[in-house]
């Protein structure tokens, strides 16, 4: 029977606040248990019923995502998604957030974010091969934001570098909405090394439950509940809820677990991440439709005075829970100990569908697995039928409201000064959100494992060579996997539906720009409180947009993460929500990495082309130009025509495979002028561009965003072959897709003309200086 000692005597109302539970939750818990929970059990329900663990606010929305496809082997529900990437190889991938921990303890918060996502990958039987990250901070004119940036980057680089997994790419954006609540999203990829995918469901009644890895301490207690609440001026008091990681133990854990998985003697595996031992045991039992009994006296402890509550809610890092074959138990224990890891039998699989926890010869918790993991409560929200009035008003904005252009100069509404287009381009390149992130990339080891094809920043997507024992396939070539993380949160703020469609489209476009076929996505939905009408409408609209884009582009969702309550309160209780940020992690495949291309120009006199959609809009509404130069965040983001998007990307990939295209780069933040500048900077070559549009404003031509546009260069020697191919393929496009030549690669300058009128004349070294030094100059 359950222990009814002093553990059961506690202030219910105060404890509910601590566990972030409501009175209705408490009544439901009592109903499910048939009695009042003791304090330990209440803590277990607190973490398992948090948004972080059970998606109680978002689950109905996530159910609409497309999750199946010809390449999908494992979708949502397991530790990570798995897809078939050909050549008898399987890719495991997922994205997770560590936002709140990074806000109060940036180094450890970010470091353990890396460690946690790596465990999700190797728990499936895959060797981690790459990490990407998507980061958001407040503007760098505040010392507190600079400190957060330093700490987060240092934490990511420390853990990734020490554990030997390359950090190969990502994105970083800056906006005041993130000042009190930075976002740290980490995506990891792994290559399956076992014949069978290792799943989490417990198997075979009587099988030993083996605890493997680091010791359990008091760090991270209640971390899942902390991650599911808003940040305020007292959040620094929650530092104990932030875990402390050890990448060297993680490295040993990776190698030891992969060795053990290969034997087939591990029946199931679950990492101890959010909610620690509570979540791992409950999910393992529920996924196997069985139960688990745990004896806390057998858990390796860092301290002697730990309570059952602390054992169960600790999120100490580098720990795994395994169900193993009893006859192989001693062999496995010795194998793990050889790696310097703790390996203790702490329980067994039972037929009764309960999680039963004992300590000091007493049962301290006894809960049905369905109550903890399967039948978790869902918060029902009303979704407003129309966009908020303030957005409808912003959507009415048109470019006619901007100052007139006179003598190729325009008045900035930000500082009331007139600037030439050349000066505006330099300003945009110095915007930290657009500028080079080399200050960050230099701190990451991107080359460890020797499979990184492009250095971070050199191409639109990261590209990893897939190889086993250095053997090429029968065609004497290596296949590869491309990955990109993307989200324009300004677009999502102004239109969550269109902005989320654009995030999926851009991530696919970036993968296509290196020559890879987009296959599937993982997503990280970073939003503010779902308890406000606007907050939940943003989340719902974003999910609708992601679903539509994924269906159209045939890139199913294999899993991901939801991070809500990303907002901060100041001393006056004023709430600042983050810009809604649904980060899309796209993966794709390429048959031969030798055919992949990067973003910079390759040869003088190569022809510069652009492909895009006539049906999709391109506009300076919602653009970086409008925000950074005019201090305006307004207008409706351009619409993406998804069928045209598919045509554009397909044509590009086919042209790359035929070796017609030498470089490619998508047109995104900053528009055409910034995209051209980036290609020049990456290659140390110039470009001569002739624009012909007659009826558009010059700033629209230079800085508009959207339109599914991709900039690419064609090798002069391949131009006729390319033209012949274009003639054949253009029959598939219809009237909605255009492909046109706009210039050629030159030596030292970026020259942009419009009907013989010079809009821009800048030396490449000027562009490079602004682009490369913007972030480092903030320190």
From Swiss-Prot:
GO terms for biological process: 'de novo' IMP biosynthetic process. Substrate binds at residues 97-100, 119, 243, 315-317, 563. GO terms for cellular component: cytoplasm. Its EC number is 6.3.5.3. Its main location: cytoplasm. Pathway: Purine metabolism; IMP biosynthesis via de novo pathway; 5-amino-1-(5-phospho-D-ribosyl)imidazole from N(2)-formyl-N(1)-(5-phospho-D-ribosyl)glycinamide: step 1/2. ATP binds at residues 55, 94, 523, 560. Keywords: ATP-binding, Cytoplasm, Ligase, Magnesium, Metal-binding, Nucleotide-binding, Purine biosynthesis. It catalyses: N(2)-formyl-N(1)-(5-phospho-beta-D-ribosyl)glycinamide + L-glutamine + ATP + H2O = 2-formamido-N(1)-(5-O-phospho-beta-D-ribosyl)acetamidine + L-glutamate + ADP + phosphate + H(+). Pfam families: AIRS, AIRS_C, FGAR-AT_linker. It is found in: Cytoplasm. Gene3D superfamilies: PurM-like C-terminal domain, PurM-like, N-terminal domain. It comes from the Bacteria. SUPFAM superfamilies: PurM C-terminal domain-like (SSF56042), PurM N-terminal domain-like (SSF55326). Part of the phosphoribosylformylglycinamidine synthase complex involved in the purines biosynthetic pathway. Catalyzes the ATP-dependent conversion of formylglycinamide ribonucleotide (FGAR) and glutamine to yield formylglycinamidine ribonucleotide (FGAM) and glutamate. The FGAM synthase complex is composed of three subunits. PurQ produces an ammonia molecule by converting glutamine to glutamate. PurL transfers the ammonia molecule to FGAR to form FGAM in an ATP-dependent manner. Belongs to the FGAMS family. This is Phosphoribosylformylglycinamidine synthase subunit PurL. It comes from Prochlorococcus marinus subsp. pastoris (strain CCMP1986 / NIES-2087 / MED4).
